[in-house]
């Protein structure tokens, strides 16, 4: 559902055969796959081995990751997947012209150290792209996600809020890491599901409702999500939530 965001960023930075792209918190690799399809040489880092296994499948890796020891997986599409975060030596040697941090669920405090390392060690002039939710009033999904915070509250479970929805939050994060803002934009990314059950399942898969499930139970959380989705159900039974995401281009 974030494909419009990925495509817009790739178009704006002319990602293609001459691009070496590094993705922070690459997740299950959809943005990497789209960049590789344009001919870019891509490298992705993530803390979650299970997500990297999904990314390897998407990149048509010739071998399985197995237990995924720290290190690289090189695929036939010039893709390299690594656990953790890039070390300064990797950033200096990689020659990356584009660095992305496009997962809006990554908290700013988690992302900040990696961005600081990029600012200190990546190639001067490299583009660094950050993304986050747009204004809450423009994001239907943000209203539904409030259910997670409310249900998790009784037991004090930590619920990461939608990241970087303030007007200058992306710029503040970039400047705080030593990067220079150099342009921004907004992209419409509607969340669409074939029915209510698919919408509930899809939202639960984000992990943002895990603390709510721990504080209550799965059935209660599913019930509350379904109720919150009611305003977004269409006459044909599908569910559609209009959302806006914002991206910032900064320079090393």
Across the structure, where does each feature detected by a protein language model lie?
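Conserved alpha-helix/loop element of class I SAM-dependent methyltransferases that forms part
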Residues: 1-20, 30-34
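A short SAM/SAH-binding and catalytic strip from SAM-dependent methyltransferases
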Residues: 96-112, 134
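Conserved Class I S-adenosyl-L-methionine
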Residues: 28-30, 165, 171-252
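Class I SAM-dependent methyltransferase SAM/SAH-binding core
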Residues: 20-89
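A generic alpha-to-beta junction signature in SAM-dependent methyltransferases
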Residues: 13-15, 36, 115, 121-122, ...
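Conserved catalytic/acceptor-binding region of the Class I
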Residues: 112-113, 119, 125-194, 210
